[in-house]
């Protein structure tokens, strides 16, 4: 499970996600990627499930970059507990993503394989995504 080794504070405020992604919104490593079209929290388990789906579909060829990391602690109160009496105990970690944020990047496979692999990854995630291709990608390569 993805989580930070050490955090400065055990609990954090919920915060608000407004606007589009200002950072992490361009392909930096691979030729293909998926970017979000919604604002949502993504957990470490969801990221790991999507990563496994991509690597299995690509049959361990090429390279995959995960561009997000869950570093926001989430708390939860036990079942059937009355309101109040303080904030709940830490439950796990999430990453808040806003529209335009690149989640995964892929390199070293043909277009069709990359598109299918990232489609499978998108099904594991709670956000709607869009498949994107690097602007200078040559479609005649690797055929």
Curated annotation (Swiss-Prot):
The keyword rRNA-binding applies. InterPro entries: Ribosomal_uL16 (IPR047873), Ribosomal_uL16_bact-type (IPR000114), Ribosomal_uL16_CS (IPR020798), Ribosomal_uL16_dom (IPR016180), Ribosomal_uL16_sf (IPR036920). GO terms for biological process: translation. The keyword Membrane does not apply. Residues 1-17 have a biased composition (Basic residues). One of its GO terms (molecular function) is tRNA binding. Part of the 50S ribosomal subunit. HAMAP family: Ribosomal_uL16. PANTHER family: 50S/60S RIBOSOMAL PROTEIN L16, LARGE RIBOSOMAL SUBUNIT PROTEIN UL16M. This is Large ribosomal subunit protein uL16. The gene is rplP.
């Amino acid at each position: 499970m993805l989580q930070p080794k050490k955090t400065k504070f055990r609990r954090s405020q919920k915060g608000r996600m407004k606007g589009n992604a200002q950072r992490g919104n361009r392909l930096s490593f691979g030729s293909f990627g998926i970017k979000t079209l919604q604002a949502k929290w993504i957990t470490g388990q969801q990221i790991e499930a999507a990563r496994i789906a991509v690597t299995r579909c690509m049959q361990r060829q090429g390279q995959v970059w995960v561009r997000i990391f869950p570093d926001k602690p989430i708390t939860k109160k036990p079942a059937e507990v009355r309101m109040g009496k303080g904030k709940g105990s830490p439950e796990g970690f999430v990453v808040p993503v806003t529209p335009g944020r690149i989640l995964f990047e892929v390199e070293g496979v043909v277009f069709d394989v990359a598109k299918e692999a990232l489609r499978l990854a998108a099904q594991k995630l709670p956000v709607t995504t869009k498949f994107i291709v690097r602007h200078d990608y040559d479609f005649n390569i690797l055929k």
